[in-house]
Amino acid sequence: MTKRVRLSDSFNPVYPYEDESTSQHPFINPGFISPNGFTQSPDGVLTLKCLTPLTTTGGSLQLKVGGGLTVDDTDGTLQENIGTTTPLVKTGHSIGLSLGAGLGTDENKLCTKLGKGLTFNSNNICIDDNINTLWTGINPTEANCQMMDSSESNDCKLILTLVKTGALVTAFVYVIGVSNNFNMLTTYRNINFTAELFFDSAGNLLTSLSSLKTPLNHKSGQNMATGAITNAKSFMPSTTAYPFNNNSREKENYIYGTCHYTASDHTAFPIDISVMLNQRAIRADTSYCIRITWSWNTGDAPEGQTSATTLVTSPFTFYYIREDD
């Protein structure tokens, strides 16, 4: 027979059954209390068992909330509490990104909008076409220029490259003969031929008026870019530096130089070049013009034979002040 523990004389039989002499609780649960969800802490004091995120700190059952959450003081609802700084924006319960010019979304991904002349290359943005260059291409497959008055069709190739560099344009030009009449010029002692280029106010070549019959375009690799250019004004000779119809400043509109023709016997014949910028317009819709004249006057013709030899001039480079964009 097991002996029962004898309670002290100071034991208080009223819950929580405290022993007044020792202030100890005898770990006695009243019969009407289930331990599920409750605990004694300290002994004899009934409390709730709380697991995170619940807590009774402060005396009442509460919900622990971390950063970004709050409990509404009015209706007690749990709400998000997130602020944003630019360029993030908050609309309702959603966070978005404020997009400026040049940015967009594609398949829910932030992306850069690229305009004409730009492309991606190995995730880097690069210039698709060289918009600082305007040219005929390296060597056109067919004759693109008609210089001789007697010609009824294109008689030579004009290779022209215009490159913007700061306030200047660098021009690179030479000629390759195609027709027999044009190449026969090499058998004359005194000749000249001129390429006239007329442009509208946007810098587009007026092919119906010009010696060059194919439009200029930007450079794309070693080829001409596809599609028409919209504005090439910045490649044009400045009308301030090279005005039209100003006789007092006419000499400022000319550039002079020399290139060569190499004859069949390898003799280099000098060719005089003169470039006239603007100065004279032949029609009201002509806003800019470039005239390039090649000439020679020698004691002997470059080619003594009567059969034509392809007339190829050496390249000539000149510079001029360009028009503003």
UniProtKB/Swiss-Prot annotation:
Q: Does the keyword Protein biosynthesis apply?
A: no
Instruction: Spell out the note in the miscellaneous section.
Output: All late proteins expressed from the major late promoter are produced by alternative splicing and alternative polyadenylation of the same gene giving rise to non-overlapping ORFs. A leader sequence is present in the N-terminus of all these mRNAs and is recognized by the viral shutoff protein to provide expression although conventional translation via ribosome scanning from the cap has been shut off in the host cell.
GO cellular-component terms in the record?
Answer: host cell nucleus; viral capsid
Q: What is the protein name for this chain?
A: Fiber protein
* Subcellular location as annotated: Virion; Host nucleus
What the record says about family reads: Belongs to the adenoviridae fiber family.
Source species: Human adenovirus B serotype 11 (strain BC34) (HAdV-11)
Q: What induces it?
A: Expressed in the late phase of the viral replicative cycle.
Would you say which domain of life the source belongs to?
A: Viruses
GO biological process annotation, one example: cell adhesion
Q: What is known of its domains?
A: The tail region anchors the fiber to penton base capsomers, whereas the shaft, built from several repeated motifs, allows the knob to protrude from the virion.
Q: How does it assemble?
A: Homotrimer. Interacts with host receptor CD46. Interacts (via N-terminal tail region) with pentons.
Main role?
Answer: Forms spikes that protrude from each vertex of the icosahedral capsid. Interacts with host receptor CD46 to provide virion initial attachment to target cell. Fiber proteins are shed during virus entry, when virus is still at the cell surface.
Q: Which Pfam families match?
A: Adeno_knob, Adeno_shaft
Keywords in alphabetical order: Capsid protein, Host nucleus, Host-virus interaction, Late protein, Viral attachment to host adhesion receptor, Viral attachment to host cell, Virion, Virus entry into host cell
